[in-house]
């Protein structure tokens, strides 16, 4: 049989490559293989150096074949554990000594049989060792056959020291059958058996596969069976020929590939699904599709996703939401139960199964509905007006719901499902599709019905979406809209108000309540005006008027009309008065009637008295005036108009007719008496003196010129002087010259002014009407400054007093401080500056004009002006020299000397002119721009701006 190992040398290299891949898998399982590699590496060096040469001399050809068939798994496990890495070296020696190793291997089998019980503890160590060994065993399979004989004896010693005890147990398992096949076993099967023992799962798998291997072969070695069972082709080759089967066994990486087929153990389920791979791809596609739920156009979208999309559409239509949401819950539950029945080993596969179950039924519906859903999103964009109009649509929609089997919809949603009903009505082509929609919403309906109903419902929903876009159905037909317009009122308001969730009826009720309240307010304010606005069209107008009423209650129509009516005739009367005035100026005869209407009542008695005699009328007027003084209420009204009437009846020129002057003097007397009666009681003493008409007449002429005197002095003394003037006045009356006054055209006012000019003193003292020119000429200018009230009065010094002596005054001590004086000085400065007249020379503006033009005021100049033009002064304590000099001057005059008691609160002080810093404080208080003189003060002009 040496020929077989020779040709077998070429294959072991390839199985080594395969085993190298297997070693990589072994390294993944546990950290034990590296430990086993180290221990076995030392054993391999010893075994290859000693035992391979000895056992190679023995005849192993026939025995190798038998051992390879029967006991190869156990022996290979022992030898492979001892020779994981050095197996490559042994490959060369095994070719030379093909038959030397079979004898020592049966020795190892005997201890193996004894130690099988202990294998339970050691298998974990054996497994990692076996995992590493197959790499080397596969490469030098023929070499490992020979050297394994003698080193087996040494192997147990090494195993006692370390983990290589596992190969000893394997040798004992072999018993005493045949030692030759052990090296064959070490090449391939041992590492896999060790791998199976290294992990609990690998051990179990090795046991299961060993049973299969025993079925195929009688050897019963579990380690080799686990590896060979994974690849049945390798086991058949091992059965055919010892060495050839061993070379095939090293292709253990293929069983590792079986681990991939171990995933197919759920192959029955996968076979049922068949499309798992394609579905997994679709499933990979689904997550982005899920994110794209709002877009219903995609046909490849996951079927569950499309179920969600119709729900989104229904979210727009409210009814569709409830229907599809209810349908979704059912397929989700059914899908979960179906997934449980499928019993997929992997959770991911279960999800795929669920998707598969749901997808096929929904795919057809989703594909059919997806283009229609494209119409639905067009409906989704709603304007605020659409939202506002939906309130009106709810009523029409409710009627539609009752028409289209609203029982089911009422169970899920009441009012929100209106658009669905509206959509279902227009779809006369597919009325059969709508009942399955209802069935789909109903839970007892089968899944197939649900799928079909979903597809139909989606189509119906898309159709409904397109028609509500037209709004014709939602807002009813134009005829029905007109009918409703006639039946119900239209609400007008902002979109935000109309878009509220509140029903339109509530808004209408509020509007009616407001209108009623406004009508009640109108009735309460104006009972007569309220009823007309009750007309339908006028009600709205009244509402607007009521708004104005709310803003101003008195501005209502009635009130405004009354005010306007009163105001318009007043304009007419005012226009009449100037015409009457003009008529009096133009024609004195035309003027009196207007005044006669007012004055005829009182003027009659004075006319009668004047007819009796010239003297009595003035007396009567005078007595009437004095009586009026007794009764102040009549003084202002009666006698004044009587005198005016007398003047109107006799309008001679003031210069020619003395009677006119006398009559006007009577008017003045009336005025003077009225003033005196209001201010002074002595006029009441006059009536008894004037009780006699004759005496009164004699006093009457006297009183005219003397009335001014009476106003100024006592009224009773100058009676004699009044009489001659009165007689003159009568003489003047005898010569009438009425045409002169109208020729002047000045009217009564000019005559009055002329009369006032004749009596300057009386007019100045009594009447406010004298020409102001005379007053200004005679009057003196008012003082521009106010003297401080706290200033002590200066004793009048005679001219003999020397002007050089500074006057001394007694003032309160507090006035020495500027803070106490500025409150009185500042107003004086302000009043003086404002009283300055404007200058005619623009190059020399006044101080007030400079201040108004924001010209900087030089403090020194302004202070000098105030000190020169005003008497504003401050106080300074007087020195003893000044006080003595002043007292001496007072003695020379004969005046009393000045003295102050210490601690009495008064001080002898001397006047002091205002200082620049004090004026500066006034400028600052008045926000006046001021500066210090250049080169003076606090650093010059630039630093002094304020």
From Swiss-Prot:
Compositionally biased region (Basic residues): 160-169, 182-195, 453-469
GO terms of biological process kind: DNA recombination; DNA repair; DNA replication
Membrane-crossing residue ranges in chain numbering: none
Major localization listed first in the record, in broad terms: nucleus
Post-translational modification: Phosphorylated in response to DNA damage.
Keywords, alphabetical: DNA damage, DNA recombination, DNA repair, Nucleus, Phosphoprotein
Cell location: Nucleus
Skewed-composition ranges (Pro residues): 1-14
Biased composition (Polar residues): 707-717
Composition skew (Basic and acidic residues), residue ranges: 54-74, 278-287, 627-636, 722-733
A matching Pfam family: Slx4
Keyword Nucleus: yes
This protein's record includes keyword Calcium: no
Molecular-function GO terms, alphabetical: 5'-flap endonuclease activity
GO cellular component: Slx1-Slx4 complex
Span list, region Disordered: 1-35, 54-119, 147-318, 339-399, 416-471, 577-748, 765-799
Assembly and interaction partners: Forms a heterodimer with SLX1.
Entry function: Regulatory subunit of the SLX1-SLX4 structure-specific endonuclease that resolves DNA secondary structures generated during DNA repair and recombination. Has endonuclease activity towards branched DNA substrates, introducing single-strand cuts in duplex DNA close to junctions with ss-DNA.
Homology family: Belongs to the SLX4 family.
Protein name, entry field: Structure-specific endonuclease subunit SLX4
Organism: Phaeosphaeria nodorum (strain SN15 / ATCC MYA-4574 / FGSC 10173) (Glume blotch fungus)
């Amino acid at each position: 049989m040496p020929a077989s190992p020779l040709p077998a040398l070429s294959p072991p290299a390839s199985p080594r490559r395969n085993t190298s891949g297997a070693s990589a898998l072994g390294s993944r399982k546990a950290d034990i293989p590296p430990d086993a590699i180290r221990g076995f590496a030392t054993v391999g060096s010893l075994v290859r150096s000693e035992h391979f040469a000895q056992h190679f001399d023995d005849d192993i050809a026939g025995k190798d074949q038998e051992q390879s068939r029967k006991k190869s798994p156990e022996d290979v496990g022992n030898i492979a554990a001892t020779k994981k890495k050095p197996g490559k070296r042994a490959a060369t020696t095994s070719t030379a000594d093909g038959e030397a190793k079979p004898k020592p291997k049966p020795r190892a089998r005997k201890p193996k049989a004894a130690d099988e019980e202990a294998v339970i503890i050691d298998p974990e160590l054996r497994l990692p060792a076996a995992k590493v060994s197959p790499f080397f065993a596969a490469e030098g399979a023929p070499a490992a056959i020979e050297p394994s004989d003698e080193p087996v004896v040494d192997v147990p010693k090494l195993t006692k020291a370390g983990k290589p005890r596992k190969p000893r147990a394997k040798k004992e398992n072999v018993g005493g059958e045949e030692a030759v096949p052990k090296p064959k076993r070490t090449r391939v099967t041992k590492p896999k058996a060790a791998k199976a023992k290294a992990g609990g799962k690998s051990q179990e798998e090795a046991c299961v596969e060993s049973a299969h291997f025993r079925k195929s072969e009688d050897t019963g070695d579990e380690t080799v069976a686990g590896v060979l069972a994974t690849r049945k082709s390798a086991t058949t080759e091992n059965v055919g020929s010892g060495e050839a089967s061993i070379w095939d066994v090293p292709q253990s990486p293929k069983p590792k590939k079986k681990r991939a087929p171990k995933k197919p153990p759920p192959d029955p389920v996968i076979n049922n699904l068949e499309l798992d791979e394609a579905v997994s791809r679709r499933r990979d596609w689904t997550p982005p599709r899920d994110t794209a739920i709002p877009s219903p156009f995609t046909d490849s979208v996951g079927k569950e996703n499309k179920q969600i999309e119709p729900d989104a559409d229904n979210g727009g239509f409210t009814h569709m939401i409830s229907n599809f949401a209810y349908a979704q819950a059912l397929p989700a539950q059914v899908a979960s139960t179906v997934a449980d029945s499928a019993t997929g080993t992997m959770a991911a596969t279960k999800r795929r199964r669920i998707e598969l179950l749901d997808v096929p039924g929904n795919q057809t519906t989703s594909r059919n509905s997806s283009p229609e859903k494209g119409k639905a999103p067009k409906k989704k964009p709603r304007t605020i007006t659409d939202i506002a109009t939906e309130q009106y649509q709810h009523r029409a929609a409710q009627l539609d719901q009752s028409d289209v089997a609203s029982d089911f919809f009422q169970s899920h949603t009441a009012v929100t499902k209106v658009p669905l009903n509206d959509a279902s009505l227009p779809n006369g082509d597919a009325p059969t599709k709508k009942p399955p929609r209802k069935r789909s919403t109903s839970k007892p309906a089968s899944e197939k019905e649900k799928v079909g109903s979903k597809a139909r419902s989606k189509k119906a929903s898309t159709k409904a979406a397109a028609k509500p876009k037209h709004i014709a159905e939602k807002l009813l037909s134009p005829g029905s809209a007109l009918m409703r317009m006639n039946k119900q009122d239209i609400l007008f308001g902002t979109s935000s108000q109309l878009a509220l969730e509140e029903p339109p009826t509530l808004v209408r009720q509020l509007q009616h309540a407001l209108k009623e309240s406004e009508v009640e307010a109108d009735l309460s304010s104006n009972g007569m005006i309220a009823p007309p606005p009750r007309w339908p069209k006028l009600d709205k107008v009244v509402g607007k008027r009521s708004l104005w009423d709310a803003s101003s209650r008195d501005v209502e129509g009635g009130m405004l009309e009354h005010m306007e009516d009163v105001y318009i005739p007043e304009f007419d009367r005012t226009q009449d008065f100037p015409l009457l005035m003009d008529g009096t100026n133009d024609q004195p005869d035309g003027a009196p009637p207007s005044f006669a209407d007012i004055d005829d009542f009182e003027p009659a008695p004075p006319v009668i008295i004047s007819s009796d005699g010239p003297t009595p009328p003035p007396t009567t007027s005078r007595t009437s005036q004095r009586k009026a003084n007794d009764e102040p209420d009549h003084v202002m009204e009666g006698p004044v108009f009587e005198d005016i009437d007398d003047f109107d009846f006799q309008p001679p020129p003031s210069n020619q007719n003395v009677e006119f002057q006398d009559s006007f003097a009577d008017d003045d007397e009336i005025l003077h008496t009225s003033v005196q009666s209001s201010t002074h009681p002595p006029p009441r003493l006059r009536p008894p003196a004037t009780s006699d008409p004759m005496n009164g007449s004699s006093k009457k002429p006297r009183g005219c010129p003397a009335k001014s005197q009476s106003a100024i002095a006592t009224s009773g003394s100058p009676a004699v002087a009044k009489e001659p003037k009165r007689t003159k006045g009568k003489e003047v009356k005898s010569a009438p010259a009425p045409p002169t006054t109208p020729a002047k055209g000045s009217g009564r006012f000019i005559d009055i002014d002329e009369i006032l000019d004749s009596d300057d003193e009386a007019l100045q003292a009594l009447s406010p009407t004298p020409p102001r020119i005379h007053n200004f000429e005679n009057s003196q200018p008012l003082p521009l400054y106010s003297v401080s009230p706290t200033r002590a009065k200066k004793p009048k010094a005679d001219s003999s007093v020397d002007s050089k002596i500074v006057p001394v005054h007694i003032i309160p001590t507090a006035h020495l401080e500027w803070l106490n004086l500025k409150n009185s000085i500042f107003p004086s400065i302000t009043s003086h500056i404002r009283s300055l007249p404007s200058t005619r020379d623009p190059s020399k503006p006044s101080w007030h004009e400079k201040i108004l033009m924001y010209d900087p005021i030089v403090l020194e100049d302004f202070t000098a002006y105030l000190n020169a033009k005003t008497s504003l002064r401050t106080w300074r304590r007087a020195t003893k020299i000044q006080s003595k000099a002043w007292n001496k001057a007072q003695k020379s005059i004969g005046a009393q000397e000045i003295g102050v008691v210490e601690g009495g609160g008064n001080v002898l002080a001397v006047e002091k002119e205002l200082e620049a810093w004090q004026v500066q404080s006034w400028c600052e208080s008045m926000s006046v721009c001021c500066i210090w003189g250049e080169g003076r003060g606090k650093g010059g002009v630039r630093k002094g701006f304020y």
